[in-house]
Amino acid sequence: MVLVVDYGSQYSRLITRRIRENEVYSEVVFPDDKVDLSKVDAVILSGGPRSVYEEDAPKLPEWFQEYKGPVLAICYGMQLIVKELGGEVRRGRGEYGRTLVELSRDPIFEGIPEKVHVWMSHGDEVVRLPEGFHPIAVSETGVIAAATDGKRFWLLQFHPEVHHTEYGDRMISNFLFNVCKLEKNWKIGDLVEEKIRHIKETIGNKKAILALSGGVDSSVAAVLVHRAIGKNLVCVFVDHGLLRKNEREEVERVFKEHFDMNLVVVDARKRFLEKLRGVTDPEKKRKIIGEEFIRVFEEEAKKHDVEFLVQGTIYSDVIESAASGKTTAKIKSHHNVGGLPEKMNLKLVEPLRDLFKDEVRKVGKYLGIPDRIINRHPFPGPGLAVRVLGEVTEEKLEILREADYIFIETLRKHDYYDKVWQAFAVLLPIKSVGVKGDARAYEYVVALRAVNSVEGMTADWSRIPHDILDEAARRITREVKGVGRVVYDITSKPPATIEWE
């Protein structure tokens, strides 16, 4: 097993995912967790938002002194090893984003060109290596980008786990097989069976209620839990009035065709919109929706004598809500995580909590879920409430539904929907001047957003052909009453998040 020590990096679970892609089992622990070293073949120390010289900065685990195997230390992990072994780290100019580095010959860089672009995210830098270490990569600004003692420590200042690092997957696989001499012995089926066993042990003969949206996350969670407890699972679809066009009807149709499950549809449109009246702050909107969601489920659970609530929370939700560890920096709360009310009368089960979106899709395919569900674009739990910037009203929701529908329909028409990871429209809280007919118009602005990603932790804006964007913009301004201008968002993640709120 490869143990990943999480120092609060947004990418810690991504390291685990890269390892699992190589069919090697991996788990994540925190620095103060107890560990059975007899099961550990290699250790990876993650990055983190702290400085090693801060008074309360996370330290090496207590068990690390006893561990004698290979270590890959990334970003903060590299600086921690350097400091602990007598080297020097100090505040630098910082390197962020895509950076060119020059590599030296080393087993971890086997099969990789001498110069590659990597993903940096650090303010501190190593200025002196510990005795016995030598640099094996230097950045274009002269900063030590990687080092090793040639025995058991390999240190990388950049993040090989993110897709923006060229040959990052190869570096991780080189560490696993060239350095650690591990063997491939873990499959996605092992993960599925392990999760089904865990769900059976957790829920037993009790009943569970599942928050079904019809998206890939909740659908995979539903099938997993159904495999474990059968008819003791009640799937509840809540129409909170924040859905896309025709979404409720589509979900009902699909699940009646493909799944032999108890499906209950709750019409809660009025109560959600009433709660959101006058609210403009995005965090408040998310919290309100999360709390109201749980109230709906608690009411429904009482009708079915249910003790457990199942949610399709995935790991990118957890990370952005800073629920993965005390050193992680919070980005925003998700209604499946930070939006939950503190006093919940149901026991929470989140079978996908440690998986990224692409892993969830692989699990879904393994379980035999139809491609039209598996390949559906991600949709936030709070729905269109976080795509209507500012106060949510029926009028704004209807405008956004139509604009979003046209954008997606246009992408499908040109066979482009499956070429982007996520695409949607956002209604901005501003109006702009325009001309319709021979008259002055003063109408809303719609932003179109499309990104390419693998796991949702990083994303690049999609280079959709101009003629497709032009067609979508023309249709929206022509067919959607109240919209006079369409813009296209060309911001990547980071610095932006994928959703606007």
From Swiss-Prot:
An example GO BP is: GMP biosynthetic process
Could you tell me which residue ranges the GMPS ATP-PPase domain spans?
Answer: 186-376
TM ranges are none
Q: Where is the active site?
A: 75, 159, 161
Question: Pfam families this protein is in?
Answer: Arginosuc_synth, GATase, GMP_synt_C
Keywords per UniProt: ATP-binding, Glutamine amidotransferase, GMP biosynthesis, Ligase, Nucleotide-binding, Purine biosynthesis
Enzyme Commission number(s) from the entry:
6.3.5.2
Under catalytic activity, the entry for this protein gives: XMP + L-glutamine + ATP + H2O = GMP + L-glutamate + AMP + diphosphate + 2 H(+)
Instruction: Detail which positions bind ATP.
Output: 213-219
- The source's domain of life comes to Bacteria
Quote the pathway field: Purine metabolism; GMP biosynthesis; GMP from XMP (L-Gln route): step 1/1
Pull one GO CC term from this UniProt entry.
Answer: cytosol
Q: Name one GO molecular function term.
A: GMP synthase activity
Q: Which InterPro entries match?
A: Arginosuc_syn_N, Class_I_gatase-like, GATASE, GMP_synth_C, GMP_synth_GATase, GMP_synthase, GMPS_ATP_PPase_dom, Rossmann-like_a/b/a_fold
Annotated Glutamine amidotransferase type-1 domain residues: 1-185
Per the entry, what this protein does is: Catalyzes the synthesis of GMP from XMP.
Quaternary structure (record)? Homodimer.
Q: Extract the PANTHER family matched here.
A: GMP SYNTHASE [GLUTAMINE-HYDROLYZING], GMP SYNTHASE-RELATED
Return the protein name: GMP synthase [glutamine-hydrolyzing]
Which organism encodes this protein? Answer: Thermotoga maritima (strain ATCC 43589 / DSM 3109 / JCM 10099 / NBRC 100826 / MSB8)
